[in-house]
A protein has these predicted regions:
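Conserved alpha/beta catalytic core and glycan-binding cleft of carbohydrate-active enzymes
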Residues: 83, 277, 281-453, 533
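Short proline/glycine-enriched turn/loop motifs at strand-loop junctions of beta-rich domains
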Residues: 23-29, 538-540, 547-548
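Substrate-binding/active-site clefts of carbohydrate-active enzymes
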Residues: 82-83, 105-109, 118-289, 295, ...
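Conserved, mostly hydrophobic/aromatic
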Residues: 22, 65, 117, 138, ...
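The feature marks proteins involved in alpha-glucan
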Residues: 1-15, 19, 39-116, 121-126, ...
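Glycan-recognition and catalytic regions of carbohydrate-active enzymes
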Residues: 3, 411, 417-426, 451-531
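C-terminal beta-strand-rich structural cap/linker in extracellular carbohydrate-active enzymes
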Residues: 24, 59-63, 558-575
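Glycine-rich phosphate/pyrophosphate-binding loop
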Residues: 80-116, 329-373, 381, 444-489, ...
Length: 575
């Protein structure tokens, strides 16, 4: 089977040749540049498009565009940019890939156990091809979905992915577009969904050429923390909106992805009658979503339940940040930074966010709790994982709570093997930008007591150093066998007793906190059964009465209440 998404942007191979289109409204003329200094004038239309067609080009041909200032720029819709964003693009024939994942239609969201990974640090090689070698391991653990951090082409050889500047081109440091497709189809053959993290709120600070020939892509009406805001609601925004809608469709159709994770939708500024996030969600639902499961996961600091309305927006789920913050405070005892907002009634807030997230009108599977992710680990000065910050018994209780709830658990790469390697912030900038990022990173932590002194801040790793990247690679040779066995056991329990009882309907859940750290949560499941959690997230015993039903799992001691860092999960049959 072959798959391709045709779009009005960039280069398209067809009929023995190729068409080239560039939206460059600021340019009077544009030339297509090919090998051996060949240039072809492009035809300009009144709406700022420049186009031409050629018959003597094939897949792999390098091309770029010469704009008014005389310099060459890559195709902003390039499917491949092997020579970094500053270099030329390469023609790709999407129909050259023969898909071998059969009649894969995805999986319903109630089956999701999501595993976030960064391609560059997931394996020693840091490539799409090498990641295939870990798929059997993930399937055996009980993972059912990969959530891959952004792969859009970025400057240099290492980056988290949120500084991408060519959103259609997988970064060449990970491999080719063909390599990425092989990773996805091999995941499908093992029953694993694949979601891709995409960034639609800004372009990276280095390597973005759009302002030179299409400044209309940006607006001064809005601001973002990371650079110029994208123009989704001003003059010429129609083309800009189409660019990102097609990008979403391109990834899901041409790469046969099972969905997307939209980064920081609170920073996607759009005052249009219909927000761009809704247009993207509807395009996915009305397109590839008609024939298979296509999921849309959001990151949204504003916790807006309207964006998760199943009928209006077609969005699937959102990361449950409040649950993480409360669990982290209870397990680690940390209260600095934003954790300071979660030091009062922490147990009650934890129970509430577990019972119904931030809205009782949404089903449990609309929320994704987590103990670790790239933000919560990587935005620490030293990138420490929770395994280094919490007592082992606290970590075990929190892991069981994460995996044995009706909400959809999100794991961070290496968590299942008890990885203790850091996940640091890293990039590959140079010159003034590199210095600004390094110093900005250190100033960011000046308000934390442990980094108040300049000497302490000087020890924060330089994000531009290759050492920060290399230190962040998972150490598979030192996997914790006991931790892995626990994840296998807990996810088997989830698969057998919880997943079959989950659906897309909001249901009643009760919660309470009866002592510091002691939480009670009772969920009503789709078949009328009730799942009861009684957990003590503290180092002191708590007088919690046992819940009715059959015990699915227990942590610590539960005789006459709950001992420190203890909990029980019971399943009560429908009445």
């Amino acid at each position: 089977m072959k798959r391709a998404h045709r779009m009005p942007f960039g280069a398209e191979l067809a009929g023995g040749g190729a068409s080239f289109r560039l939206w460059a409204p600021a340019c009077e003329s544009v030339e297509l540049l090919l090998a051996r200094e060949r240039s072809v004038p492009m035809h300009r239309t009144a709406d700022g498009w420049h186009a031409t067609e050629l018959e003597d080009v094939v897949a792999g041909t390098a091309y770029s565009f010469r704009v008014d200032d005389g310099d060459a720029v890559p195709d902003p819709a390039s499917r491949s940019n092997p020579w970094d964003p500053q270099g030329p693009s390469a023609l790709v024939d999407p129909l050259a890939h023969e898909w071998r994942d059969g009649d894969w239609r995805g999986r319903p969201w109630n089956e999701a156990v999501v595993y976030e990974l960064h391609v560059g640090t997931f394996t020693p090689e840091g490539t799409f091809a090498a990641a295939i070698g870990k798929l059997d391991h993930l399937a055996r653990v009980g993972v059912t979905a990969l959530e891959i951090m952004p792969v859009a082409d970025f400057p240099g050889s290492r980056n988290w992915g949120y500084d991408g500047v060519l959103p259609y081109a997988p970064d060449a440091s990970y491999g080719t577009p063909e390599d990425f497709k092989r990773l996805i189809e091999e995941a499908h053959r093992r029953g694993l969904m694949v979601l891709l993290d995409v960034v639609y709120n800004h372009f990276g600070p280095e390597g973005n050429q759009l302002h030179r020939y299409a400044p209309q892509f940006f607006t001064e009406a809005h601001q973002t923390p990371w650079g110029a805001a994208i123009n989704f609601d001003g003059k010429h925004s129609g083309v800009v909106r189409d660019f990102f809608i097609h990008n979403a469709l391109y990834w899901v159709i041409e790469f046969h992805l099972d969905g997307l994770r939209l980064d920081a939708v609170h920073a996607i500024h759009d005052d249009s009658p219909t927000h761009i996030v809704l247009d993207i969600a509807r395009a996915l639902a009305d397109g590839p979503g008609r024939d298979r499961h296509v999921h849309l996961v959001l990151e949204n600091e504003r916790n807006d339940p309207a964006l998760l309305d199943r009928r209006a927006t077609h969005a699937t789920a959102q990361w449950n940040d409040p649950w993480h913050h409360c669990a982290h405070v209870l397990c680690s005892g940390e209260t600095s930074g934003y954790y300071g907002h979660f030091t009062r009634d922490t147990a009650r807030l934890l129970a509430q966010s577990f019972a119904h997230g931030f809205s009782e009108s949404l089903p449990a599977i609309a929320f994704m709790p987590f103990l670790q992710n790239h933000d919560q680990v990587g935005n620490r000065a030293m990138g420490e994982r929770l395994a280094l910050l919490a007592p082992p018994e606290a970590l075990r209780l929190a892991q069981a709570a994460l995996l044995l709830s009706p909400q959809v658990p999100l794991l961070f790469m290496g968590e299942e093997i008890g990885a203790k390697t850091p996940f640091l912030y890293f990039c590959d900038f140079h010159g003034d930008l590199a210095a600004a990022v390094r110093e900005g990173r250190r100033k960011e932590f000046a308000a934390f007591p442990e980094f108040a002194a300049e000497e302490a801040r000087s020890k924060i790793p330089d994000p531009n150093s290759a050492d920060a990247f290399l230190a962040s690679k998972i150490d598979w040779d030192n996997a914790n066998a006991g931790c892995l066995a626990r994840f296998l056991e807990l996810l088997a329990l989830r698969r057998e007793h919880i997943v079959p009882r989950l659906d897309d309907t909001p249901r009643v859940a009760q919660f309470d906190a009866v002592a510091p750290g002691a939480v009670l949560v009772d969920w009503t499941l789709a078949d009328g059964a009730r799942l009861h959690l009684r957990a003590n997230f503290s180092a002191e015993a708590a007088p919690i009465e046992s819940a009715p039903g059959t015990i699915l799992h227990a942590e610590g001691s539960s005789n006459g209440g709950l001992g420190p860092w203890s909990g029980t999960w019971t399943l009560e049959a429908a009445r």
